[in-house]
Swiss-Prot record:
The gene is Tomm22. The lineage of its organism: Eukaryota, Metazoa, Chordata, Craniata, Vertebrata. The chain crosses the membrane at residues 84-103. This is Mitochondrial import receptor subunit TOM22 homolog. It comes from Mus musculus. Keywords: Acetylation, Membrane, Mitochondrion, Mitochondrion outer membrane, Phosphoprotein, Protein transport, Receptor, Translocation, Transmembrane, Transmembrane helix, Transport. Pfam families: Tom22. GO terms for molecular function: mitochondrion targeting sequence binding. Residues 1-41 are annotated as: Disordered.
């Protein structure tokens, strides 16, 4: 105890062990441990149910209605997005993909014709000679 008084005079803060006698400090620790054990017996659902009791019935019912409405809206949006995605995907496959395949096929045919012209007539004629609307090759350069 004399050490505690001397430490207090020096301006240092006292620890709980220095303030309480040793027997009382041990009892305080045991009581804290017992309090913790009592709190651990309670489940999470029991704690949440207990927390709801601190709000008035009006607030609880409003929160419940808001949650139900949010759940309903989320379900409706999910169903709508599924239907919209299905309609969009099938429409794209039926309407757009055939056009894409035909344009790709046409480009491949044009590329093959260009390659055949280059093979038969030479490298310079494949680019300028066979294309309609293109300028004729210059007479001095061959």
């Amino acid at each position: 105890m004399a050490a505690a008084v001397a430490a207090a005079g020096a301006g240092e803060p006292l620890s709980p062990e220095e303030l309480l006698p040793k027997a009382e400090a041990e009892k305080a620790e045991e009581e804290l441990e017992e309090d913790d054990d009592d709190e651990l017996d309670e489940t999470l659902s029991e704690r949440l149910w207990g927390l709801t009791e601190m709000f008035p019935e009006r607030v609880r019912s409003a929160a419940g209605a808001t949650f139900d409405l949010s759940l309903f809206v989320a379900q409706k949006m999910y169903r709508f997005s599924r239907a919209a995605l299905w309609i969009g995907t099938t429409s794209f496959m039926i309407l757009v993909l055939p056009v894409v395949f035909e344009t790709e096929k046409l480009q491949m045919e044009q590329q093959q014709q260009l390659q055949q012209r280059q093979i038969l007539l030479g490298p310079n004629t494949g680019l300028s000679g066979g294309m309609p609307g293109a300028l004729p090759p210059l007479p001095g350069k061959m």
